[in-house]
């Protein structure tokens, strides 16, 4: 049987069987070392060759913090540490051959009671980052101060220097109740109200740092790298950097991206879609037009003669980055121009076709905008999806 079956002593850089005092000292040292604001971690992040390497270092830091807290949940407790060192209980290869005091001990083996509990993870801390469409195209780096709840290192999350085991739950934090119904017996674990699930009670004065609360508020600066091409709803996760609970894996800090709408552009997949003014003579004869990209660059675009005005311009690889770099799609607004331009154009255009056969009623016309079609209430939710699909259905690309 291994003397360190889960590697708890190894992660603390201790020899198997080290005392609880040695474990506490090593835990505090390792947690301080792997905190993102520690000199050791700052130096590693500073020397990282790329953003990807920095993200990897932060992820490894969170994983190390989680492993340290898993080790702490066992080796800080004399009873659990004794079982761990001897390979007994949940750390053994199989159930013992007997010795259960009653049915509740058997139930505890199967359900993972407090003395044999599963390692649960604390809920994540989530924040929404709102960026403009331009920022989602070019990317950006933002810094945020995030408050999280950490286990008090002064009292090791016990609330005081001297604590005693809760007599109501025998230190388990939960107790098992039995109910009989129609000849069947059901067993259920209930959080102990005598110790509020902690398994112990404070003797004497509470901890001066946390005032008996067992946890303290911690503020950490997070550098969030928002990469070019990020989509609305994407998540940037810092594993193990969130709230802590004794005996639990620390939670994550998650930043969720929200992208604002833009007055000039919209995103369709990885394509960037916009509008461009094109003089009629350029549309007919070809030429050059100028356009300001969403990233601020000035583009000089060569335009071939239009075969039909139901045509969109496609500039390859000028869209959003991703697994496939998108294109810049521009819907042309054909501009006729001044009176002199109109006269020159009329000289080269062929005469209109003859009046078709039939009886016609004369009416006058004027220019106006297209009205929005009426929609049933049920169709309103489809408006966003339909606008993107209808755009591409009405234009051909070349």
From Swiss-Prot:
Q: Could you state a single Gene Ontology molecular function term? A: Hsp70 protein binding
This entry carries the following GO cellular component terms, namely: cytoplasm
Q: Which keywords are on file for this protein?
A: Chaperone, Cytoplasm, Lipoprotein, Metal-binding, Protein transport, Repeat, Stress response, Transport, Zinc, Zinc-finger
Q: Which GO terms describe its biological process?
A: protein folding; protein transport
Q: Where is this gene product found?
A: Cytoplasm
Name the positions where substrate binds.
Answer: 144-146, 221-222, 253-255
Where does the chain cross the membrane?
none
Residue numbers binding Zn(2+) 2: 166, 169, 192, 195
Give a yes or no for keyword Hydrolase in this entry.
no
Q: Where are the zinc fingers (CR-type)?
A: 139-219
* Keyword Transport attributed: yes
Spans of repeat CXXCXGXG motif: 152-159, 166-173, 192-199, 207-214
Q: Which InterPro entries match?
A: DnaJ_C, DnaJ_domain, DNJA1/2-like, HSP40/DnaJ_pept-bd, HSP_DnaJ_Cys-rich_dom, HSP_DnaJ_Cys-rich_dom_sf, J_dom_sf
Domain J, chain residue ranges per copy:
7-88
Return the annotated region ranges for Disordered.
367-386
Question: What are the binding positions for Zn(2+) 1 in this chain?
Answer: 152, 155, 207, 210
Q: Which cofactors does the annotated protein need, by name?
A: Zn(2+)
Give the note describing cofactor binding and stoichiometry.
Binds 2 Zn(2+) ions per monomer.
The protein's matches in Pfam families, at most eight in alphabetical order, are given as: DnaJ, DnaJ_C, DnaJ_CXXCXGXG
Q: What family is this? A: Belongs to the DnaJ family.
Q: What interactions and quaternary structure are annotated?
A: Homodimer.
Q: What does this protein do?
A: Probably involved in mitosomal protein import.
PANTHER family in alphabetical order: DNAJ-LIKE-2, ISOFORM A-RELATED (PTHR43888)
Q: What is this protein called in UniProt?
A: Mitochondrial protein import protein mas5
In its UniProt entry, the species of origin is given as: Encephalitozoon cuniculi (strain GB-M1) (Microsporidian parasite)
What is the taxonomic lineage of the source species? Eukaryota, Fungi, Fungi incertae sedis, Microsporidia, Unikaryonidae
């Amino acid at each position: 049987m291994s003397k360190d079956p889960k590697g708890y002593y190894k992660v603390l850089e201790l020899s198997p069987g080290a005392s609880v005092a040695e474990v506490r000292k090593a835990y505090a040292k390792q947690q301080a070392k792997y905190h993102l604001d520690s000199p050791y971690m700052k130096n590693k992040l500073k020397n990282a060759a790329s953003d990807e390497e920095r993200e990897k270092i932060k992820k490894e830091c969170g994983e190390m913090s989680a492993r340290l807290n898993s080790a702490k949940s066992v080796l800080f407790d004399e009873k659990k540490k004794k079982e761990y060192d001897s390979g007994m209980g949940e750390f053994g290869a199989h159930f013992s051959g007997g010795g259960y005091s009653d049915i509740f001990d058997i139930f505890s083996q199967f359900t993972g009671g407090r003395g044999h509990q599963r390692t649960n993870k604390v809920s994540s801390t989530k924040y929404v980052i709102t960026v403009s469409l331009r920022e989602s195209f070019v990317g950006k780096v933002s810094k945020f101060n995030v408050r999280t709840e950490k286990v008090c290192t002064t009292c090791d999350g016990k609330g005081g220097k001297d604590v005693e085991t809760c007599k109501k739950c025998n230190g388990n934090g939960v107790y098992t109740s039995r109910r009989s119904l129609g000849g069947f017996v059901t067993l259920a674990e209930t959080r102990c109200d005598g110790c509020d699930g902690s398994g112990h009670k404070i003797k004497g004065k509470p901890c001066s740092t946390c005032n008996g609360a067992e946890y303290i508020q911690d503020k950490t600066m997070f550098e969030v790298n928002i990469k070019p091409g990020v989509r609305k709803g994407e998540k940037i996760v810092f594993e193990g950097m969130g709230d802590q609970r004794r005996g639990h894996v620390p939670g994550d800090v998650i930043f969720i991206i929200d992208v604002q709408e833009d007055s000039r552009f919209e995103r369709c997949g990885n394509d960037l879609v916009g509008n461009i003014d094109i003089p009629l003579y350029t549309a007919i004869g070809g030429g050059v037009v100028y356009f300001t990209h969403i990233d601020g660059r000035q583009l000089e675009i060569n335009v071939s003669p239009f075969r039909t005005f139901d045509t969109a311009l496609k500039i390859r690889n000028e869209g959003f980055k991703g697994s496939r770099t998108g294109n810049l799609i521009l819907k042309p607004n054909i501009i006729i121009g001044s009176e002199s331009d109109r006269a020159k154009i009329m000289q080269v255009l062929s005469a209109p076709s003859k009046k078709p056969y039939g009886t016609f009623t004369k009416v006058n016309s004027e220019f106006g905008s297209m009205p929005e079609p009426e929609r049933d209430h049920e169709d309103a939710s489809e408006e966003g999806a339909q606008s993107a699909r209808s755009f591409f259905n009405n234009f051909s690309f070349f």
